[in-house]
Amino acid sequence: MALTKPKKIPRYRRNKPEIRKVDKGIIHIRASFNNTIITVTNVLGCVISWSSAGACGFKGPKKGSAFAAQKATENVIRMVVINRATVLITGCGKGRDAALRVIHQNYIPIHAVLDVTPTPHNGCRPPVKRRI
């Protein structure tokens, strides 16, 4: 059985992403060394929009760069209009400051910036270091 290719839709007929309005929102920034993921939720925690460096077209080690985090944040902000935002930052990657800078440059009123990176209080024993 032969597979049929889906028809290509011309650019002028493609659906444009709809802009969603939120009164109070939470912007979650997860910045790891390998990627940066930005998620916008409402106060209840329902996801409104999200983007990541990988979803923006960056591959390999470029996903962990500050520029990739900047572009991912711009993609999310383009989809959402927020009247008041709380920013929760997790992780210690290069995209932390870049994403926060983009939010500030786009005139989104920031209510609070919180660092919620999990830190152990001497919990699990770390793995043994490799000897090469």
From Swiss-Prot:
Example of a GO biological process term: translation
Subcellular compartments: Plastid, Chloroplast
SUPFAM superfamilies noted in UniProt: Translational machinery components
Keyword Plastid set for record: yes
Matches recorded under Gene3D superfamilies: Ribosomal protein S11
RNA-binding among keywords: yes
InterPro entries per UniProt: Ribosomal_uS11 (IPR001971), Ribosomal_uS11_sf (IPR036967)
GO molecular function ontology, one term from the record: structural constituent of ribosome
GO cellular component entries: chloroplast; ribonucleoprotein complex; ribosome
Record's subunit section: Part of the 30S ribosomal subunit.
Family: Belongs to the universal ribosomal protein uS11 family.
PANTHER family listed in its UniProt record: 40S RIBOSOMAL PROTEIN S14/30S RIBOSOMAL PROTEIN S11 (PTHR11759)
Protein name per UniProt: Small ribosomal subunit protein uS11c
Annotated organism of origin: Gnetum parvifolium (Small-leaved jointfir)
Organism taxonomic ancestry: Eukaryota, Viridiplantae, Streptophyta, Embryophyta, Tracheophyta
UniProt gene name: rps11
